[in-house]
């Protein structure tokens, strides 16, 4: 190997500012034509540094083989004459091994590991980390077992294995590593403690995570940040904010990651006052303009209902990326400005702003899209044009968009063409079938999902129960509720029980629905009583209806639906005095019925309207058409259902009711 060529190759690929990291004599070789290059080799300091830079900057294809060749040419790296040279040589070999592992050359890394003239526990840790980094988990744990059996592990080994323990399935592994750390004494290492905290919280074992934290004699900012982040991930926002407050009173100063977690806690708990206080701290310490901090602030303000403050931050930012744009777009949609969110997205496209799949996925989640199939199809065209069709999250959004716009066929097409699906994909398609009344198709898809060993979630069962309710599959609905608890260990929520009540109510089994409510393991809320009352209203059951209404009045005294539904029951039974009392009580309490809004898309434009709407610019023409349609409907056999009319005018010619 020509050493002059090696040095020239190296320095030609290094920026001028980095070329000085090599010893001056190595750089001068290029200017010394009389130098005998066969006698020149890189020392361990230069070699280790270059190997590190090569891996960090992604220069492996150009420089990796050259550096490896230079190491092979140096006899000191094979047969060190003393302990110091042996130690230095081992550093070089481990640096080379790390380079191969980090660059995804796992096969070469294993081959190098087997052929290395010297190894230590760091060498094994590098290969172990390489296995995990390249998703060779099984091979990695085989090596770990061998390391543990021979006692050839250290605290870094434990932190490496804990780095992959980030789902509930790894909870037992985390506990085993914790026990091993205690037995080996490495539990006193702060890095091991920090990793244990992170793993426990990510596995959902928040109590164990707090236990590790409470037992640590030494803590640093990473420790406290790990606990705060873990609490937020487990939706313990109030606890996270309390710990953040205690942290600020102590001697540990928060870092940017800590502030991000604290802002996430404010977002999750909608604590805008605390969020504003954190904003002031960020301004005080001069880190409020960091891009990730700005995005977190926008998210906090928008989720706390202050979209104006979020927009102010967005307009003042010096740099915009896909994350900040997605945050402000979702913020607009969540605060009732769906149309503005779409217009914002269109302006982004017109301005030539580079968008990614996450932005498109966020746009597809805007409810305004659900009223405009034309706009949804345009977004689908954009997805194809930008080559986002392989993105699972985008496809999930397309499935939901098409089904909510009434196009079940295109929802199925997107689902079947997906190159990769996750549990959300299956849930979205099952929900689409349920939404369109295709209960049997939803159940069949669920069977396919379980056959492929895709684990269902509580959302899966919610959609399935909706499907059973709409097609009257009572026994199947009960079976699914039991399967949810007994087989999959998923605790039903109020929404699941409401589906069962709705299912029984649709079938006219009102007393059975009442008995089911009485047997619930949780206190019924207004959704449950409203479902029963709605069924009683449909079937005209005064006895159960009055009971459900009374319970609903106690749970939600300001609810207009309770008054309207019980009044409907009285109307259907001809109990006009009782109906009048209900309406009188409703007026005395100042309770008003919330106005429902409908919409329709005509020629790519969405029109929204309410009952007896007179504000539309074409209102007069619309009512003329409606007046002409009613006699045609009567001729076709339509008769108005007078059971639920609160006050019938008696004019059947135009169907006027109030």
Curated annotation (Swiss-Prot):
PPR repeats: 189-219, 220-254, 255-289, 290-320, 321-355, 356-390, 391-421, 422-456, 457-492, 493-523
Listed GO MF terms: RNA binding
InterPro entries: E_motif, Pentatricopeptide_rpt, PPR_At4g14850-like_plant, TPR-like_helical_dom_sf
Identification of the protein by name: Pentatricopeptide repeat-containing protein At3g05340
Entry-linked Gene3D superfamilies: Tetratricopeptide repeat domain (1.25.40.10)
Residue ranges of the TM segments: none
Signal peptide: none
Residue span of region Type E(+) motif: 604-634
Family stated for the protein in its record: Belongs to the PPR family. PCMP-E subfamily.
Keyword Repeat (UniProt): yes
UniProt keyword Repeat, yes or no: yes
GO biological-process terms attached to the record: RNA modification
UniProt region (Type E motif), positions on chain: 528-603
């Amino acid at each position: 190997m020509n050493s002059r060529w090696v040095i020239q190759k190296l320095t030609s690929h290094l920026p001028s500012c980095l070329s000085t990291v090599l010893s001056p004599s190595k750089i001068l070789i290029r200017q010394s034509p009389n130098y005998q290059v066969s006698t020149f080799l890189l020392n361990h300091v230069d070699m280790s540094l270059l190997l590190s830079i090569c891996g960090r900057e992604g220069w492996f294809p150009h420089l990796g083989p050259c550096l490896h060749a230079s190491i092979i040419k140096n006899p000191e790296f094979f047969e060190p004459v003393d302990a110091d040279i042996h130690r230095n040589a081992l550093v070089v070999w481990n640096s080379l091994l790390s380079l191969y592992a980090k660059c995804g050359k796992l096969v070469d890394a294993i081959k190098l590991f087997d052929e290395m003239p010297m190894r230590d526990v760091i060498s094994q840790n590098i290969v172990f980390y390489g296995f995990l980094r390249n998703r060779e988990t099984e091979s990695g744990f085989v090596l770990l077992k061998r390391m543990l059996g021979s006692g050839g592990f250290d605290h870094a080994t434990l932190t490496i294995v804990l780095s992959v323990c980030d789902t509930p399935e790894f909870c037992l592994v985390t506990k085993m590593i914790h026990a091993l750390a205690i037995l080996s004494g490495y539990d006193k290492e702060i890095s091991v403690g920090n990793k244990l905290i992170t793993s426990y919280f990510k596995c959902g074992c928040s109590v164990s995570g707090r236990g590790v934290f409470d037992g640590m004699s030494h803590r640093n900012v990473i420790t406290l940040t790990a606990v705060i982040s873990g609490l937020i991930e487990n939706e313990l926002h109030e606890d996270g904010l309390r710990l953040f407050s205690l942290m600020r009173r102590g001697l540990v100063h928060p870092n940017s990651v800590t502030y991000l977690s604290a802002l996430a806690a404010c977002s999750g708990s909608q604590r805008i006052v605390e969020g504003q206080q954190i904003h002031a701290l960020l301004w005080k310490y001069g880190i409020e303009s960091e891009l990730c901090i700005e995005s977190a602030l926008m998210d906090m303000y928008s989720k706390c209902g202050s979209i104006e403050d979020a927009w102010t931050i967005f307009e003042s930012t010096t740099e915009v990326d896909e994350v900040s744009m997605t945050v402000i777009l979702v913020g607009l949609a969540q605060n009732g400005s769906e149309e503005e969110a779409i217009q914002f997205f269109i302006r982004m496209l017109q301005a030539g702003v580079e968008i990614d799949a996450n932005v498109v996925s966020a746009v597809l989640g805007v409810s305004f899209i659900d009223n405009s199939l034309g706009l949804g199809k345009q977004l689908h065209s954009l997805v194809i044009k930008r080559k986002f069709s392989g993105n699972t999250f985008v496809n999930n959004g397309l499935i939901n968009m098409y089904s909510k716009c009434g196009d079940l066929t295109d929802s199925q097409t997107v689902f079947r063409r997906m190159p990769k699906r996750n549990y959300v994909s299956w849930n979205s398609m099952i929900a689409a079938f349920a939404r369109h009344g295709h209960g049997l198709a939803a159940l069949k898809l669920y069977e396919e999902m379980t056959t492929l060993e895709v684990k269902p979630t509580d959302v899966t069962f919610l959609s399935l129960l909706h499907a059973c309710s709409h097609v009257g599959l009572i026994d199947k609905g009960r079976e699914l509720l039991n399967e949810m608890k007994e087989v999959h260990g998923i605790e039903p929520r109020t929404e699941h029980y409401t589906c069962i009540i709705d299912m029984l109510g649709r079938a006219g089994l009102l007393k059975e629905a009442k008995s089911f409510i009485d047997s619930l393991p949780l206190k019924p809320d207004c959704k449950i009583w409203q479902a029963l009352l709605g069924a009683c209203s449909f079937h005209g059951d005064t006895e159960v209806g009055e009971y459900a209404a009374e319970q609903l009045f106690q749970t939600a005294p300001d609810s207009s639906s309770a008054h309207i539904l019980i009044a409907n029951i009285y109307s259907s039974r001809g109990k006009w005095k009782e109906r009048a009392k209900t309406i009188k009580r409703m007026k005395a309490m100042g309770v008003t019925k919330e106005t429902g809004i409908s919409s329709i898309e005509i020629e790519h434009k969405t029109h929204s309207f309410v009952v007896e709407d007179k504000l539309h610019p074409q209102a007069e023409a619309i009512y003329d058409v409606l007046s002409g349609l009613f006699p045609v409907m009567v001729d076709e056999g339509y008769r108005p259902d007078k059971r639920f009319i609160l006050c019938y005018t008696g004019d059947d010619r135009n169907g006027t009711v109030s």
